[in-house]
Amino acid sequence: MGLIGKDLIGLRDMPAERIKLILDTAVPMKEIIRRQIKKVPTLRGRTVVTVFYEASTRTRTSFELAAKYLSADTVTIAAAASSVSKGESLKDTARTIAAMGADAVVLRHPMAGAAELLARTVDAAVINAGDGAHEHPSQALLDLFTVREKKGRLEGLKVAIIGDIMHSRVARSDIWGFTRMGAEVRLAGPATLLPPGLEKMGARVCSSVEEALMDADVVIVLRIQLERQQQGLFPGLREYARLFGINRERLRLAAPGAVVMHPGPMNRGIEISPEVADGLQSAINEQVNNGVAVRMALLYLLTGGGCRK
């Protein structure tokens, strides 16, 4: 078992001390990335398997880079190209992974709870890279790391999360993570995309984007999934941009020097204007860079911290 437990399934039940350990461990990992030779032998002899049942560029590449910078061997299983497409179940895939002798498995799956199911089946450390609309813990951890790096703290900050909360696993993990670390989380978006029960998670649901943005220290903009328009969950892209899009004028409501983030990929001109995405307050590119450092920390703590049997 690693220094933060066997697996990373979500942030819902993760204590603040464990989150802090991950963020603190990511600091020296970022120093490694800044070196001319971005490689250390920390996880030499370890095998990390990535299994993605949904398309991903950023997350998969980030985990693969993290593993390679730590000298781990990586195996990528693209679900469409594997026996999954022939009807193989998740448990069958788990047995195959176990036979490979993997030390860690990074899983993305459209079904909520898939990572937890896999964790019960294999001895390897399982990292949830997104399971349905449930959680995406490594994204939230890199968001926390980025904000702490920019602001010097997390406790007492006002964090506004804007957009499609209902279908966003990032939003759920961010809510758990930021509230656990003492931040105030505000939510805003179309009423049809704000599910019930958000207050029970410790967040405040605002009646407008403007209310959520008022004096906010951090603004997290969520990608609007275009297929939701076809389902009638919001009126149209132009209308969404007018009512909920984060532009320069709306951003003035936030605190001076507010940090703007987006988990990607972005719909420029819809949920976020190009001026904001590319502006001085944007930390979107830093999120990508920090994502590798945080995932290096996770792989180290779960498989290379000297506590695995």
From Swiss-Prot:
Catalytic activity: carbamoyl phosphate + L-aspartate = N-carbamoyl-L-aspartate + phosphate + H(+)
Subunit structure: Heterododecamer (2C3:3R2) of six catalytic PyrB chains organized as two trimers (C3), and six regulatory PyrI chains organized as three dimers (R2).
Protein name: Aspartate carbamoyltransferase catalytic subunit
GO MF annotations in UniProt: amino acid binding; aspartate carbamoyltransferase activity
Keywords: Pyrimidine biosynthesis, Transferase
Pathway assignment: Pyrimidine metabolism; UMP biosynthesis via de novo pathway; (S)-dihydroorotate from bicarbonate: step 2/3
Classification via InterPro entries: Asp/Orn_carbamoyltranf_P-bd, Asp/Orn_carbamoylTrfase, Asp/Orn_carbamoylTrfase_sf, Asp_carbamoyltransf, Asp_carbamoyltransf_Asp/Orn-bd
Annotated organism of origin: Pelotomaculum thermopropionicum (strain DSM 13744 / JCM 10971 / SI)
Residues annotated for carbamoyl phosphate binding in this entry: 58-59, 108, 136, 139, 264-265
Task of the protein: Catalyzes the condensation of carbamoyl phosphate and aspartate to form carbamoyl aspartate and inorganic phosphate, the committed step in the de novo pyrimidine nucleotide biosynthesis pathway.
Assigned protein family: Belongs to the aspartate/ornithine carbamoyltransferase superfamily. ATCase family.
Record-linked NCBIfam families: asp_carb_tr (TIGR00670), PRK00856.1 (NF002032)
Signal peptide: none
Alphabetical GO biological process terms: 'de novo' pyrimidine nucleobase biosynthetic process; 'de novo' UMP biosynthetic process; amino acid metabolic process
Gene Ontology CC: one annotated term: cytosol
Record-listed L-aspartate binding positions: 86, 169, 223
Enzyme class, spelled out: transferase
Listed SUPFAM superfamilies: Aspartate/ornithine carbamoyltransferase (SSF53671)
Pfam family, one: OTCace
Assigned EC number: 2.1.3.2
